[in-house]
């Protein structure tokens, strides 16, 4: 498909959340916009968010929910914040529904978000090109803009917005295939690693409790220093550990592993009891009349999941079916208490990008104007979304960044065209 006869005001490369927002914002200013997506459908990654329900923003926009370049985040977020996001989606037909601070479409279908964006693009006259793979951007001085080329692709545009994502969830389109094109422009990247993901472990592997989910607290230690912690539903797996609390601290762990540092997760298997309360509970369970003498599995019945109990015994060097003798009780209580409150696992590797919800890292912020997201190397080229060195924890924060950065890139690219006319 050739669009060489048309000089577009703005070409957006990448039809995900941020790219669609950038295209809509630019088109609303009256600019001619073409949106280029190498997959056969726009917004494929949106469809998988929030377990198919699409948690698209959050009521609590706390600074600590965002990692990476905090200054860049604040500069962009104030231009299009949570309230702007809620108003925007309501305007295009998505009634927001809040549950425990998490905003979803009232339909509780991610498809509602994707379709609403797609319909708005169509209503605004944005040209959508799917199945197109651009592989080069070059300056076209005669056009006072850029030429985007690829197989059967030849698109001239005054401004270019790149919203291709990084490497997370490659099947949805974020496969990293455009990163070499960006590097060929002279841009550099901070380390790109998986985030919002589980981790493989070494040493003791809790795979004997694979599939077990439990309320716990995970504390992350990097080179023996506590860096972050989070509480919620943790899951032991065949490969190591997973669950939302693990996802929330994953950025720090992934970056530290990339830097070859020692990374450990210390898990409190029973955070609802203090150390003293747990010691008393264990003492009461061990010290029963002799006729109640039981093995470890029986002692923990009703306290911990059975598979988790077997895993705990294995970790402590006890045989689950063995009945401890009374003289062994004090040591057993101490060892088990310490293990429950401090189950230590060495993390060796994040799960691959295929299993990561996002990637952290991105184009270096010192190569980008923090107010407009315009390249400092190539005026007229803008970046948005996951490509930038900002990422969030679970809870709608990464989609909020997509909306905010897409809006900013689309707005400033449009304004620049207006300024060049005057």
Where would I find each of the regions flagged by the language model?
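Beta1/beta-strand and adjacent pyrophosphate-binding region of the FAD-binding site
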Residues: 4-18
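Glycine-rich FAD pyrophosphate-binding loop
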Residues: 11, 27-51
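An anion/pyrophosphate-binding glycine-rich loop and adjacent beta-alpha core
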Residues: 40-42, 47-48, 56-60, 95, ...
């Amino acid at each position: 498909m050739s669009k060489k006869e048309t000089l577009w005001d703005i070409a957006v490369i990448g039809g995900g959340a941020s790219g669609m927002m950038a295209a809509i914002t630019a088109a609303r200013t009256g600019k001619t916009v073409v949106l280029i997506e190498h997959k056969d459908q726009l917004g494929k990654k949106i469809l998988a968010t929030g377990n198919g329900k699409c948690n698209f923003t959050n009521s609590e926009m706390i600074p600590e929910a965002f990692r990476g370049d905090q200054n860049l985040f604040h500069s962009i977020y104030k231009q299009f914040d949570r309230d702007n996001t809620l108003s925007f989606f309501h305007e295009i037909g998505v009634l927001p529904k809040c549950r425990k601070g998490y905003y979803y479409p009232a339909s509780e279908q991610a498809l509602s978000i994707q379709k609403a964006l797609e319909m708005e693009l169509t209503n605004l006259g944005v040209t959508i090109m799917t199945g197109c793979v651009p592989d080069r951007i070059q300056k076209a001085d005669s056009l006072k803009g850029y030429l985007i080329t690829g197989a059967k692709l030849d698109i001239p545009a005054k401004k270019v917005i790149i919203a291709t994502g990084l490497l997370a969830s490659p099947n949805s389109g974020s496969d990293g295939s455009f990163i070499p094109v960006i590097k060929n422009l002279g841009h550099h990247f901070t380390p790109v690693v998986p985030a919002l993901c589980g981790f493989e472990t070494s040493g003791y592997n809790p795979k004997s409790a694979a599939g077990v989910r439990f309320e716990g607290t995970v504390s992350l230690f990097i080179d023996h220093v506590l860096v972050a912690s989070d509480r919620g539903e943790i899951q032991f797996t065949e490969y190591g550990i997973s669950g939302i609390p693990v996802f929330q601290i994953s950025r720090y762990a992934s970056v530290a592993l990339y830097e070859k540092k020692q990374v450990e997760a210390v898990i409190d298997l029973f955070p609802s009891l203090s150390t003293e309360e747990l010691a008393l509970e264990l003492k009461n369970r061990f010290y029963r009349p002799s006729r109640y003498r039981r093995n470890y599995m029986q002692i923990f019945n009703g306290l911990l999941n059975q598979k988790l109990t077997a895993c705990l015994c294995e970790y402590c060097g006890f045989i689950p079916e063995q009945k401890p003798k009374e003289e062994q009780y004090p040591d057993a209580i101490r060892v088990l208490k310490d293990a429950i409150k401090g189950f230590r696992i060495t993390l060796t590797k994040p799960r691959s990008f295929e299993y990561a919800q996002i990637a952290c890292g991105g184009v270096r912020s010192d190569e980008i104007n923090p107010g407009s997201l315009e390249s400092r190397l190539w005026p007229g080229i803008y970046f948005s979304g996951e490509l930038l060195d900002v990422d969030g924890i679970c809870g709608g924060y990464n989609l909020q960044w997509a909306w905010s950065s897409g809006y900013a890139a689309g707005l400033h690219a449009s304004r620049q065209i207006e300024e060049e006319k005057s």
